[in-house]
Each structure stands twice: as C-alpha cells, then as structure tokens.
Amino acid sequence: MTTEDHLLRTASQHSDSSGFAEDSTDCLSLNHLQVQESLQAMGSSADSCDSETTVTSLGEDLATPTAQDQPYFNESEEESLVPLQKGLEKAAAIADRRKSGSQDFPQCNTIENPGTKQSTCSPGDRVTEITEVEEDLFPAETVELLREASAESDVDKSSECEFTQYTTHHILKSLASIEAKCSDMSSENTTGPPSSVDRVNTALQRAQMKVCTLSNQRMGRSLLKSKDLLKQRYLFAKVGYPLRRSQSLPTTLLSPVRVVSSVNVRLSPGKETRCSPPSFTYKYTPEEEQELEKRAMEHDGQSLVKSTIFISPSSVKKEEAPQSEAPRVEECHHGRTPTCSRLAPPPMSQSTCSLHSIHSEWQERPLCEHTRTLSTHSVPNISGATCSAFASPFGCPYSHRHATYPYRVCSVNPPSAIEMQLRRVLHDIRNSLQNLSQYPMMRGPDPAAAPYSTQKSSVLPLYENTFQELQVMRRSLNLFRTQMMDLELAMLRQQTMVYHHMTEEERFEVDQLQGLRNSVRMELQDLELQLEERLLGLEEQLRAVRMPSPFRSSALMGMCGSRSADNLSCPSPLNVMEPVTELMQEQSYLKSELGLGLGEMGFEIPPGESSESVFSQATSESSSVCSGPSHANRRTGVPSTASVGKPKTPLVARKKVFRASVALTPTAPSRTGSVQTPPDLESSEEVDAAEEAPEVVGPKSEVEEGHGKLPSMPAAEEMHKNVEQDELQQVIREIKESIVGEIRREIVSGLLAAVSSSKASNSKQDNH
C-alpha cells in the first residue's frame, strides 16, 4: 500500500463503505484526499440519510475515478489563471460525455462566478450545494444558485452510503511532496469514466485556485480556504497540535431557507489549534452572506488567523449540533452577524463568582484583594476580616450586620447572598491555609544563618517584621472567631422563636448556613493554630539570635507580651447570653485544673467578671498558647510568653474586666525553684503586688523574668537546666492545648446540638 493510501486511511474512517480503498493508484489516493480535505475543512456534510456523510452521493456500485484534471496546489498568481480556463473547458467536456454515454452517475454541473465557486450534484430528486464564498472581493455581484434535477439519473437512494463519525486527523505528509506528485500526475491526463467525486473535485479545485490567487492580494487580513487550511494543518500536525473537526453538520431539510454554517478555526503561533462548534445562520440572499462574512472578518486581529468558511448544505438538523465539544450553537436572526463562539482567555472563561476555583494570578495578590472583586450582592465583605486579618485587626463588619439580615429575606434567591459569602470565606480560608505553608518567612530557622553572628543581624529585621504581621493576623482571627460565635449563638436563640413560622425551604437554608458557619469556624481555628505555630517558631529564632544581649531582647519580649494584652483588652461587642457565660467559666476551670495537674499554674475567674472578657479570654486560650491569662504566669523561658512589663500595664487599668493570679516577685534570681507554685498558695494581695511589680522594678527585672533567668545565670549547669525546662514546658503546653481544644469543641458542639434539638421540638409542638 502506498504512502498516500495510508494517509487516506488515516484521514478517513469510512473508506470501506465509500469504495475509496479499492484502487491504490497515486492519483486516485490524492484525488480522494483532496475531496476529503476540502469538504472536511469546510465542515460540510453530504446529502445522505445520516449526518455523518462527508462525500456527496457516492454509491458502492459506482466506479471510482482514475482521472485527475489539474494540480491541486498552485501557489503562483501567474499560473493560476491558465488552469482555471482549462478547468472550465474540461468541465464542459465532462458534462457532454456524461450526457452522451453514462446514465449511472448523478448530474453535476459547475458554474464559475467572480466571487463564488459552486458545484451542484443532483442524485435523483435530492439537491446538494457545496459553496465556498469569497466574501469581500466582489460584494456587489450576485451568486447564482443552481438546482437542476436530473431526470436521467437513476441512482437508487439505497445506494447512498453511511459513514462513521470523524475523529481527529493527523496530516503529516509534506506539502511539497504532495504538490510534486500532483503536478506529475496531472501531466499524464489519463481519461476515464467520470463520477460525481470527479466533478465535485473539479469544482472545488477551481474554487481553491481562484481563492488562492485572490487571497494573495489581501493586505490586512487573510481568509483561509481548504488549501491554506491544509498547510496550517501540516504545520500544526508537525508541532503536535492536530486540527480537529468538531462535529458534522445537522441533516434536517429547511426549505426554502438556506442555513449557513460558520466554523471558527483559531490558529495562533505556538498555541493549540482550536475549532469552535459551528453556528448556524438563516440566509436568504448571497449579498447578505458576503456582507456578514466581511463583518465577521473585520473583528479579527492581526496576530491570529481566523478561518470562517460558510457552507450551504441542503440538509440541516439543529438537534444534533450540541454534540460537539463545546455545545453552544446559537441561531442568528436574519441580517445578524453569525455568532461563532470565540475562545476567551483562561481568566475570562472562569466564572467571576466561582466558589471552587481560584485564578492562578490571585495567589500572588493579598487576600484582601480577592474578596472585593467577587461581591455581587449588597452584603458585607466578611472575608476581608477573616483571611486577610492584617487589613483591619478589629473591623468585623460581617459580625454586626449578619444578625440584622433575616434568613427569610435571603431565601428569595436560590443561591442566597449570605451563603455565597460564607462559601467564599471558607474558600479563602482554605487558600490562606495552603499559602501559609508556602510563605518563605515562616519555614523555620535558617540553618545557614545560625553559626554566623554577622548573618544574624541581617536576618533579625525580617523575622521581626514577619513576627509582627503574624501577631496582627492571629489576633484578628481570634477576635473575629469570637464575635462570630457570639452572634451565632444569639441568632440561634432568636431563631427558636420564629422557627415554627418558617417554611421548609427557609428551614433547609438555615440548616445549610449553620453547617457552613461551623465549617468556617473550624477552618478559622485551624488557620489560627497554624499561625500560632509560626509565631512560636519565629519567637524561638528571635530568642536564639538575641540571646547574647538580654537588655535588647526586652523590647522584643514586650512586643510578644502585648499580644496577650491586646487580645484580652478587646471585649466582644455584644453581650453573651447566660449559657455561654457558664460554658466559658466551666471551660476556664477545666483549663486551670489541667494546668495544675500538669504542674503549671492556672488562673481564676471571679464570679463578678463580665461575660465579654470571659468569652474572649476563653476562646483565645483554647485556640492559641499566647493569648490567655494563664500564660502570663509561665516565666521559665517559654517562647510564647512575653515580658511582664507590657501586659501588666493594661491589666492595672482594667482590673474590673480581667484578673489573674500571678506568681511573681520583684527579685527574679530568688525565684529559681518556685516557678510552678500553684495559685492556691497565693493571696489576692500578692496578685495586686505582682501586677504593680514591673512598674517598680524596671527593665532589668522584666528582662530576667521574660527570659526565664537564661541570661541572668552565667553557669553552664543553669543554662542546661533551663533549656531542658523549656523543652519540657513546650511539650506540656502542646499536650494541654490539644486537650483543651478537644474539650472546647465537644462543649460547643453539644450546646449547638441542644439548641437545634430544642428548636426542632418547639416546631413540632407548634405543628401539633
């Protein structure tokens, strides 16, 4: 089998039924290849019983042609006119021979117009028009549409063959070799009995040469026909981008209206070749066809090559068009520009309100910018206060405005605005969790900077900046989550009153939003814990860098301590209900008992304490190591604890809001072995004295207390002992934090379940 036969079998999946593979001569193979390529490039379908036919009216009992009239690819402008005249003469001779001698083939007449080449084959009473329109060369010329019914043709309809669906074609044959073989074979000019394939081929060939000649004269833009399309196919097939035929055209006869199919082929250098699904436009006159094609070409740019090929098949069926790759087939009204679905760039093709995908360029932008571009409803921007907490530490617009929106208002829209916002928040939190591990300043100590003191000084400012940013982020996350839980419990209590008045749709939405809020709260807690781990790691690095200079590190340790003070001095904006206050007090007592059992000091909560401070204190304790009052008591070099000086000043000013048992005296060296004294052994006078102690002692005692006596003891044994204590307390702190977090989750989930069950029981009673 020759190379052309192999190429033909690759390009055509229906060679057995059409009889193409019965003759293996080179000219026959190229003849069929030309017919296949021309029709396939235009995306046309043939006049057959199904929609997958791509060759017009070819029966199995018909003889295959062996003659080839003219070369297929003639690029020169000077040589193209002579074969055109020869083609006209040969077409007339073929028509005469067919009328005189052959009764077995359908009639095929070819007529040349200045801007249009048409071939009309009529098997029996069926009509097929294969039209290639060259649009803006002669816009004033009219195109004749010939429909000649042949009374001489006796081809049975049962002889029309059905073809399988097209698949992706790879045309890898060199264009130069094809042209050379075509010109060699055209010189032989062997004559044989013509067939409908031969006549269609002759018409398409003349149209190709005319289009090629006239398209070379274009300056600004180019219209690709089947010859140019074959070249582009060859180029892109070499690179590995096959040109795909999206789908064959439908096959329902809409008479007398012609349906013009528009296939948009995007060819851009270095990118994948794409064929859009065909769009169909109802046409009445050829003048409109030319004007519309001209308008479609004016929208094309210089960098991309657009091939718009208009075909007027006699049989169209609109129902089968959505089977193509992108099933968007649009009907254009009379006189409108045909709508070819253009391929938008990847950022534009994604939905702007997508909740499950994020644009690739957004990973480099701050998280606060992500949320402002997505809001489509007049609801507060909640994710600005959650994920990008460094934008506003205390601004939580969502917390205040969420309670003012009843759920019944949101149930009018199927995807409610609040649900969209909650899903967006959840999505942003998860993205920030992923980005947090990729943040270069949070990946732990720099091994190269550890041995050299010259590099320590250069790394230190970066660590400090990152440390401060993480403090603000974690503090804002903690505050927002606290307020979110306040409002959530308040709303649950309010909903119990109106739950029986809600419809089923509103109740379903309430439950869905409740689940979303739970997910947001859990993700926020995970993010907060990860931030806390980064803070601990950075604080350890800063302590290691600043260890030779204890007095300089007092400012840094004070900065660490201000984190706890700020957290505890910012109460929740709303009063928490009685059950929540009892829950937080119970949780605080549990934490104090756990601290005593592990050998650490806990803290006391007086009964007269306000609910805001209890709630913020307990939630910050459960989710982070550094933000609770009990951690201000750990003075043995724990990295999460801070200097005594800065936290104590707000505590003196807010004695009514917050009290804690502090085991400190002004003289730090005398407290070597008494760090883990239980709070029961201390009186309230000692607490007050300890609160005022840093003001009296000055920076030296702050440094000694904050560092847990590491710089104050020069002996090597004391240093080793303190390092062991640090490691032991860090392990204890991690165990305690995990236990407290589990207990807190169980308590909160139990409370929410109790409220939900009471809500359901109230609704049942109301129904009865």
From Swiss-Prot:
Residues with Phosphothreonine modification: T665, T677
Compartments where found: Cytoplasm
Cellular component terms (Gene Ontology): cytoplasm
Keywords of this entry: Coiled coil, Cytoplasm, Isopeptide bond, Phosphoprotein, Ubl conjugation
Sites bearing Phosphoserine, chain numbering: 153, 177, 246, 248, 255, 268, 276, 312, 378, 411, 549, 564, 569, 572, 627, 643, 670
Cross-link type Glycyl lysine isopeptide (Lys-Gly) (interchain with G-Cter in SUMO2), residue numbers: K317
Biased composition (Basic and acidic residues): 316-334
The keyword ATP-binding is annotated on this UniProt entry: no
Primary residence: cytoplasm
Coiled-coil residue windows: 468-546
Pfam name, any one: SSFA2_C
The keyword Transferase is assigned to this record: no
UniProt-recorded name of the protein: Protein ITPRID2
